[in-house]
């Protein structure tokens, strides 16, 4: 497969960028011609950022799975589409060709049809990182059902909230999942999530861990039994349902600055075109490259760069079930050596974690197949960038530092491997079609330069094809979250620096959202969970610098129980109890790293918590707390400083 829209020189990047901003309809219309359509569009773009309304390839008809699977069958039926490496290195890996993927997706699509799933139905997927997860996602897309994948680390309560919000009618899960040395009982977590649920008709359960599970007659079905029924029907191919360009493809829940996670909705055509375009250009993907994205499909990175983009490009995507440190810290390097991986796309958290083991685990591995390295999820610190460059890339592989979000669908700011220059710690240049602007808190463009840098809140001025379309069931929330802070701009929630060359460095969130190990967690969400613990009066959560995770979670907790402040042992028990509550309500990814018991929180006279002060204390910047005289009770700050962990 060739990619006529692949940028090959720096001059071509600048030309493409200019064309994309000056003539977005022509630019994206020309790229979209390279895909399979049932009917071409009537209009490339219709938009405003006030409602907001964003429509790409309006009137176009297609199915994304015809672009990810069917169109490759004529010439590449026997090419590996997905290579799967299991959690346990002693277990055999699996190779799924495009021909097999077509069969697997068709048969599971028929399973869904047999059980009454229709176009527009919401199907929740809660599975481990096995090929059946990708197959389930694509089978939903094939019949026009809207998939909503939930990361396997979320609790029953978190799942229940998402099922309720999406009004999901079907669930696809596994008996259990392997993650390093742990077995996660996915089906029993789903059972807990379904207590009191009235919308779910069926739960389809795929066998992975052979964990004993409860199966309810009339509701729960085994994946394998349902496939056997389809085989008995003699069905080997299912026609893809024709979708409108703007039909929803999936819902993916992400944390916001308020407590309730929001369901980000992506559409079909724009998402397909944009993820493919960024994949081919950022990584300079060649048709026979093996691409290894280490993310989980439960996050946007896995949706876009394990499933949809590599497959729409006719590429080969490596999917890994386990974690980088199991059975030892050489696992990534084993996989790269074993399969001769060409492109590695991972998170700074993983790199920092592997750095802490030293070079022993890297030694003895042949990493010479690597051509491009990438990072995603959070800004990469320079120390980790240099370690990655020297020890993994051997100073021969460009590192693409990609900035984007669940809401943007695909990569927004990044150097292109070997084409545009990289810079340690900098995401550098925006993708074609992405017009950035830095604004001050009033929404005015930052025009003053300090020490060669512009500093402000990062916004986008015009739509790109994979722009968020809405938050599921609540369009007003989409407007207020992203398009109301600064009128006619998409507000990213991130702060940034820009140099005189136009290169951008992301400095981190400017709202009440934490970035922990590359995963977004809302402070309000964690506070709500802590506050549900018996004995907790109030809490405040902030981020602080963490050597491995990038940001850690620091919780200040007012506890009424008689023994929070007495002996260390009792306080420690309460800490553990609170952590257990957070795990139950949200999941282990949201557990605070530090809990400090306090008698009060720094509040203004109007009752607002001064998080700025709490952040400074958590960061250890005790000499720059600023003016505390406006606080209701300034003495609270002294007490907090004395008890800092």
What is each PLM-predicted segment?
Residues 65, 82-138, 155-160, 215, ...:
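Conserved AMP-binding/adenylate-forming core of the ANL superfamily
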Residues 78-80, 204-205, 211, 216-253, ...:
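Conserved pre-ATP/AMP-binding loop-to-beta segment of ANL
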Residues 150-176, 190, 337, 344, ...:
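AMP-binding/adenylate-forming catalytic core of the ANL superfamily
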Residues 205, 548, 584-609, 621-644:
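AMP-binding/adenylate-forming catalytic domain of the ANL superfamily
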Residues 429-433, 444-482, 521, 622-623:
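Conserved ATP/PPi-binding loop(s) of AMP-dependent carboxylate-activating enzymes
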Residues 437-462, 498-501, 569-571, 575, ...:
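Conserved beta-loop-beta connector loops within the AMP-binding
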């Amino acid at each position: 497969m060739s990619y006529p829209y692949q940028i090959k020189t720096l001059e071509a990047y600048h030309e493409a960028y200019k064309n994309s901003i000056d003539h977005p309809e022509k630019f994206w219309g020309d790229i979209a011609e390279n895909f399979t359509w049932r009917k071409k569009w009537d209009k490339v773009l219709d938009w405003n950022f006030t409602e907001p309304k964003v429509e790409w390839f309006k009137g176009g008809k297609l199915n994304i799975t015809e672009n990810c699977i069917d169109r490759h069958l004529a010439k590449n039926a026997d090419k590996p589409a997905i290579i799967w490496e299991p959690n346990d290195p002693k277990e055999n890996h699996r190779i799924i060709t495009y021909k097999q993927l077509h069969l697997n997706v068709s048969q599971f699509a028929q399973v869904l049809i047999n059980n009454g799933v229709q176009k527009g139905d919401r199907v929740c997927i809660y599975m481990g990182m096995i090929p059946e997860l990708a197959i389930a996602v694509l089978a939903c897309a094939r019949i026009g059902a809207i998939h909503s994948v939930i990361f396997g680390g979320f609790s029953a309560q978190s799942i229940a909230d998402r099922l309720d919000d999406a009004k999901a009618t079907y669930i696809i899960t596994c008996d259990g999942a392997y993650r390093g040395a742990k077995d996660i009982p996915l089906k029993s977590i789903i059972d807990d999530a379904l207590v009191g649920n009235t919308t779910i008709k069926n739960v389809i359960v795929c066998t992975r861990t052979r964990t004993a599970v409860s199966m309810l007659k009339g509701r729960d079905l085994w994946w394998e039994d349902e496939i056997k029924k389809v085989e008995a029907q003699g069905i080997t191919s299912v026609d893809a349902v024709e979708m409108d360009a703007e039909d929803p493809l999936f819902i993916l829940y992400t944390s916001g600055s308020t407590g309730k996670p929001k369901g980000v909705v992506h559409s079909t055509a724009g998402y397909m075109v944009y993820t493919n375009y960024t994949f081919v250009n950022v990584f300079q993907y060649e048709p026979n490259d093996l691409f290894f994205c280490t993310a989980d499909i439960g996050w946007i990175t896995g949706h876009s760069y394990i499933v949809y983009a590599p497959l729409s490009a006719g590429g080969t995507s490596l999917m890994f079930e386990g974690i980088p440190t199991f059975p030892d810290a050489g696992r990534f390097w084993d996989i790269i050596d074993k399969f001769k991986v060409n492109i590695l796309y991972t998170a700074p958290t993983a790199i920092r974690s592997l750095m802490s083991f030293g070079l022993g685990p890297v030694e003895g591995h042949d990493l010479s197949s690597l051509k491009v390295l990438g990072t995603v999820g959070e800004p990469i610190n320079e120390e980790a960038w240099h370690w990655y460059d020297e020890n993994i890339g051997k100073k021969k592989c460009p590192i693409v530092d990609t900035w984007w979000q669940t809401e943007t669908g695909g990569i927004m700011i990044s150097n292109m491997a070997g084409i545009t220059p990289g810079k340690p710690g900098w995401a550098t240049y925006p993708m074609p079609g992405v017009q950035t602007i830095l604004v001050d808190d009033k929404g005015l463009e930052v025009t003053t330069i300090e020490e060669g840098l512009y500093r402000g809140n990062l916004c986008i001025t015009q739509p790109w094809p994979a722009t968020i379309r809405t938050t599921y069931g609540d369009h007003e929330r989409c407007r207020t979250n992203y398009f109301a802070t600064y009128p006619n701009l998409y507000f990213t929630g991130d702060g940034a620096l820009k140099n005189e060359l136009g290169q951008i460095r992301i400095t981190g969130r400017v709202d009440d959202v934490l970035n922990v190990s590359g995963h977004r967690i809302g402070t309000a969400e964690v506070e709500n969970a802590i506050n549900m613990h018996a004995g907790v009066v109030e809490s405040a959560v902030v981020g602080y610098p963490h050597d491995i995770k990038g940001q850690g979670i620091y919780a200040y907790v007012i506890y009424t129980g008689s023994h929070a402040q007495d002996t260390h042992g009792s306080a420690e028990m309460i800490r553990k109890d609170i952590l257990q509550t957070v795990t139950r309500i949200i999941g282990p990814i949201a557990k605070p790293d530090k809990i400090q018991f306090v008698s009060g929180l720094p509040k203004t006279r109007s009752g607002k918590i001064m998080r700025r002060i709490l952040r400074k204390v958590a960061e250890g910047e005790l000499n720059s707390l600023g003016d505390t005289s406006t606080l209701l009770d300034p003495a609270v700050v002294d007490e907090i400083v004395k008890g800092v962990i």
